[in-house]
Every structure is written in C-alpha cells, then in structure tokens.
Amino acid sequence: ELARRNSDPSYEKWRVNNRNVYEYFGNTNWYDVFYKDYTTGHQHNISVTGGGDVASYYVSGRMFEQDGIYNAGDEKYQQFNVKAKGIVNVKPWLRVENTTDFMSRYSHQPTSHTGISTTPMTVSRMLNHQAYPVAMVTNPDGTWTEAAVYTGWAGFVEGNSWRKDRKFDVNNRTAVTIDLLKDVLVAAADVSFYFNQTDRRQAVNSYTYYTGPDSSGERPSGSLYEERSYNRQKVASSATLTYTPRLGDNHSLSIMGGWNIEDYTYKSNLMSREGIIIPGKPNFSLLEGEAMTLKDNGSYDWGLVGAFYRVSYSYKGKYLLEASGRYDGNSKFPSNQRWGFFPSGSVGWRISEANFMKNANWLDNLKIRASVGSAGNGLISDAYAYLSTMSIAQSSLLNNGSVFNYTQAPSPIPKSLTWEKATTYDLGLDFEAFNGRLNFSADIYRKKTTDMYVVGEELPAVFGNSAPKGNYADMRTDGWEASLSWRDSHKVAGKTLSYNIKVAVWDNTSKITRYTAKTGTLPTNYSINYYEGMTLGEMWGYKCDGLFQSDEEAQTWANYSKFTNRSATWQAGDPRYLDLNGDGYVNNGNNTIYDHGDLVKIGNTTPRYSYSIQGGVRWNGIGISMMWQGVGKRDWYPAKESGYFWGQYGRPYSMALPWHN
C-alpha cells in the first residue's frame, strides 16, 4: 500500500481508518525538513596601530554574524570584539602597559521540549526517535501531525519556543615594569579584572497535534517562561622581583621571587512561571500560573593566594640547574588543610658543549635532562565543601492552613579536603643538527597524582545522606612522547622555497593505585566508578559467541532474565552471550570487581598511540600548510541512545549492554 500510494500521485498520502484515526503513507525526509543545504555568515575586521619609542598603541575590532542551519526558527549568532593595548615608556627604567578586551555575544536558538522544562531536547535525538519517514508534517486540514510536534518542528515553525542568550565579557590588565638596576634587578607587577554577565531568557510553549479529524493531543502539557542571570568576576594581582647578577662568561644565574592573589565571585538568579497567555509575547505580567519561582540559583566567593620562586644556574652553557616552588592557599579548603607546597627541580647536560664534541660541527645541540616537579590542583566545584550545610525545603503538609519550611539533613564533611598533588618524573633528550634543520625530542615520564578529589566510602542507607567527595584516591600515569622535524629552503626560479615537516607521537596509560572506598563498583558509560587497581578507560561487557541459529537454541541457552524486558523472549538472530561463571545465568552479579558475574574487560576507551603530522611549503609569498591528527588505537562502544549506529536495535538490547547502564 505504501509503495502504491507513493508511485501514483493520484493517491492521497493519508487516509482515515475505521477508528477515525489518520494513517500516513508518506515518504518524508525529515532532515530536508529541518536542515538547510548551507548557511551563511559574514565578519568584518578593523585595526589601527601607531606610536613611537615612547608610546605605542593597538586597537582592533571584529563583527561576526552567522545564520542558523535550520529551515525555521530564526536561529542566529552575533559577536562583537574590541581589543585595545597601549604601552608607555615613562622613563628609561619605567614601563607601563594596559590591555583591554571586550566581547559581546547574542544567540537565538529554537528549542524542542518533551515536558515543562527549560532543558531542551537535542534535535538529533528527536529525529532519531520521532521522525518516521511514513509520517507527514501536516494533516490534510493543515493541522500538525503528532510527528511534527514530537520532533519539535511545529515549535520551530511557530517560533515561540526558544532560548536567547546575551553575554558580555570585559577583561582588563594593567602591568608595570621597573628596571631598578639595568638588566640586573627588575621588578614587575600587574593587576587584572575580569567581568562576565550572561542573561538568558527561555520560553517553552505547547503545541496541538491531531491524530484524527476529531482527536487531538498536546505536547508539552503546559507552558513556561524563565529568566536567568549569571555574574562572574575575577580580580587578580601578582608581583615579581628578578635578580640576574653579572658573574662573568662562565656562570649564569637568575633568581626570581613573587606572589599572586586571585579573588572570584559568582552569582546566579532565576525567575520562572508557568502559563504563557500570549505565546509570541512571553512576559511575567502575561502569565497565569499560580506559582512563581524566585531563587538564588547558586552564589559563592572563593580565593587563592600564593608565593613562588625560581632559581636557574648555568655553567658555560653546559651544565644546567633549576629549582622552583610554590606555596599556595585556597579558601575552598578548611583552615588546617588550606596550604600546600609544590617544589620542582631539573638538571640538564648539554653534551654538544663538551670538549670531546667540539669537532662535531654538524651538531647544534645535544642535551639530556631530568626533572621532578609537583603541581597542586585546588579547582574543586564546591566552594564550601568543608562546611556542613543544611538545605531549606517547604513541606507538603499544612500547619494551621499554611505550609511551613524545614531544614534537611546536614551535608557530611570529608575527612580530608586539600590539594590534589601531581608529581611528575621526567627524562628527556633534545637533539638539533645541520644548522637547526633537523630536530628531535623525546621524553619518558611517570606522573603520580595523590589525594585525588573523588567520592569516598559508601555510607549506610540509615545515615540519610550520600558520601561526600574528598581526597580518597591516588593514580599513576606512565607515558612517553617523541617528535621529529625537518626544515630547509632552496632557491627556485630565483625565489626562496622553504618547507617544513614535523611528526609527533605520544602515549600514556593511567591506573588507580589507591582508593579508600572498597565497594568496587564497575565503571559504566554514564559514570566513572573507581576501584583500586583499575586502569582508566576500562570497558566491561559480555562475551558474545555469535547469534542464535534457532528459537529452540535461544530458549535452551542460559537464563537471560537479568536483561529481559516485560514478556520479551530471546529468539533466533539475537546475540548469544556466554555464561562464563557457569551458574546458568548471564548477568553482571553485583556489578562489582568482587562479583561481576559474566562480565569481562572488553576494551578501553583511552586513546592510545596518538600522532600528529604538520607540514608546510612557502614560495614567493604563496604558502600552504597542513596538520593531521590521529589515534592509533581506541576502543569505542556507542551509548544506548546512539540511534544512528544501532538503528531499531538501540533500545531493545540496552538492558543487555552493561556499558549502557
């Protein structure tokens, strides 16, 4: 019937069945419905520069605008940038400079929603699940079909479900450099300010569809208007003093010390209300919902302060020594765990400067080096994780006819909350020859990350709260990297032809060496669960032994009830998973490293043997460059919603794929 109606234009692509419901016989390409073949954009740039020995300046501006890729919905993006930089040499020993960046962005994006929520669904997912080719966009009377509403196309066309963002960024840095003793003692200081303001407006409207001449539905089941504002500020300052004494031709010494301070502020407010009266003009005065949500959607302040130093020494450019360190404090940690010291050191020997290499004129540089260095990471998401906080909620019960507020259970405080510390041990080799044309560099390293910020031991259910994050794990990363490059130039037709090529290869693996939580829960596609001894990126799954050849074989195989939905039965053509532990069931046990049933490691998602190739050629003002990047090995398993990969088998087998859960 479908083929007959599509081959003969005299037949309608729809009919009303005996239940008074539309039946469709379309051949709709929903990608053509939604997407343009191309989109357009334009940008304009302007810059002005000038000055002399005493003062110089640079000012640039950019305007960029691009239309969206959808055939409806008026998607648009606009951006304006202005950058200004000025330098003034007030005195031969005093230099002042200032840099200001301003950026303004505006975006209008049509959205699709399955419920009264400002979290939109992605178009690709809605097309995957709701865009049936046999379905039509509109009914014969011009009303929307269910597919048109469920995919979001109706909202795109009517243009009243959208998200509009307007963002402003201002970044200013002022720096002063004072040459106290010319080329010997130099002081420098700077102060910077960053401000970001984001205003977001969102409208969610409902759309009516008809499944028959007299039957209709609505999606979403209501409407909502929301306004959010985000405000971010950062003030930072630093100062350094560098001492470089003159010690003769054989010795070179540099000593630098300084401090820095950073202060961050974040504020977010939200206001929303349901019941849009006029879909094209959402406004809080034109909403009929009874409840209006007004709340502080997250506000915090936090800061960093630190002191640092670096001492570098070189003897005849042959033996190289360097020591450095930082002492940092972070307001996100409790007072007794707030500070951390992170030292580093390195040594190097330029073999090419040794006496026995003096006659190797082809060799420019040959250096071996070793280093050990530590760095602290204090960028945890919660600025007040060291405080036990209690949320305030509103009871659903009445007290004298009114609802009342109550406090929820206080949040637990982790035993240890301090800096993550990453210590890297590195051995390296640098080689340069033939007047800098040939270069080779290689490193092998081990990085030990201690006090990782992760979820701690699972708490008993009677505790009434989830386990807090803290410093509960350590990790070891082993890796190497190498690069080889060649560059040269020749005369071609009286003009210089220059070319270059560079190949780089690198690899690393990471393993959890300590984890205080002993639950041993296996990782999945949607959550990273650590256990001691785990290699990062592990994928666990069932071992497959082909497909069932008959229904009888499927029914007499191991028990599949662990991942059988409703009354479904396994039959010929379904995958045949192995019962590896011989208990008669194919399942994941307790889904832990101690009891994983028939699960085995089937791969690893970590990219391995990554590589890049860069090259370029330039002649007579004409140039071409290229860059290739790749991964030598990586295991990948698509998620259960990857409909473009799984097709109609995406959800039927999702219960049988533990990596999905």
State where each predicted segment sits.
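Conserved small-residue
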Residues: E1-V21, L270, S489-T605, F645, ...
